[in-house]
Amino acid sequence: MHTMEVKEYRVGIADLNVAKSPDRIITVGLGSCIGIALYDRINGVGGLLHIMLPDSTQFKNVSNPLKFPDLGIIIMTDKMKEKGANIRNIKAKISGGASMFNFSDKSMVMDIGRRNIEAVRKKLKELSIPIVAEEVGGNKGRTMTLDTSNGIVQIKTVGVGMKEI
């Protein structure tokens, strides 16, 4: 029996990748950033986006739309559709949004992690994409891996270990 070789695609900060089963997509260094894994189980298409900031409308010139959930999620769903995904089948799993800096005055940093979480939830809701699992908040960095053969997302949290969502 011929086993298919599994490729692993990396996603940097303000970056995305889309793949078909059985490939895997991984992003490291999720602090206040959010990793958004979208998966169409029926068509075996997955995508992973690593956003940094909550809202592109706060910026005059957007050099990289993948920094933001309001733009990046749309770009990712379009790329998934090109690979055969149907938007109606897509489910989301999200991770990240940590508060990486312990300032005594939380409002001083405008808690970017929390704002990122809210912005991602809002955009997914607008697109009628349900969030089926999440691992967000806290104050530790995470690595996120999407397995496009089954939609399982592995979260590795610094100093905590591995978890599947």
From Swiss-Prot:
GO-annotated biological processes: chemotaxis
Domain of life, per lineage: Bacteria
Keyword Transit peptide: no
InterPro entries: CheD-like_sf (IPR038592), Chemorcpt_Glu_NH3ase_CheD (IPR005659), Cytotoxic_necrot_fac-like_cat (IPR011324)
Keyword Hydrolase: yes
UniProt EC number: 3.5.1.44
Enzyme class: hydrolase
Record GO terms (molecular function): protein-glutamine glutaminase activity
The reaction(s) this protein catalyses: L-glutaminyl-[protein] + H2O = L-glutamyl-[protein] + NH4(+)
Keywords, comma-separated and alphabetical: Chemotaxis, Hydrolase
Pfam family, one: CheD
Primary role: Probably deamidates glutamine residues to glutamate on methyl-accepting chemotaxis receptors (MCPs), playing an important role in chemotaxis.
UniProt cross-references to PANTHER family, sorted A to Z: CHEMORECEPTOR GLUTAMINE DEAMIDASE CHED-RELATED
Protein family (similarity comment): Belongs to the CheD family.
HAMAP family: CheD
Protein name: Probable chemoreceptor glutamine deamidase CheD
Organism: Clostridium tetani (strain Massachusetts / E88)
